Amino acid sequence: MNKLIYVAVFGVALAQLQGCTTAGGEPVNLDRRSAGAYIGDQEIEVRAKNRMRDTFPIKVANNISSTSYNRQLLLTGQVPDQATRAKAEELAKGILEVRTVFNELTVSGATSLASGANDATVTTGVKTRLLRDKTVPGTKIKVVTENGVVYLMGLLKRAEADTATEIVRNTAGVTKVVVLFEFID
């Protein structure tokens, strides 16, 4: 089963790389990660999701999101208790390729459909503002929004990161900004 998943992920990633199509909203050729790191991040996300689904009831696993950027794994979503939160982090840290786990899971009930729609709107607003600003490499920033909290991931220069963070802080609907950038200068 794991081999089948690996082949499927690799096939999709390879097809995307050949045409430089968009993946997760960003063209692969505009990413500061290498093609290998990009594929590795997709594999990490699949492995994390599978570990959650193999361990927790489907209702719990479906409320845990895994986002990997340059082998740093961000966990967001809602879990029913602290023990589940800790177990999810342990499972994520057990993925060999992962360098760092950012456990941003909250102990609460699942968010509403309206909250999810609001998060999508906030993400769109953030990405639009980042892409409009010519001093920020908006295509190189991964944006994740959960319950109004915006998480920023990417490989940026410090000045780019400072500007991007300020843009996001001043975007409608953003309640908090969590900066997870890695600096390249």
Listing of model-derived features with the role each one plays in the protein:
Residues N2-D185:
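N-terminal targeting leaders
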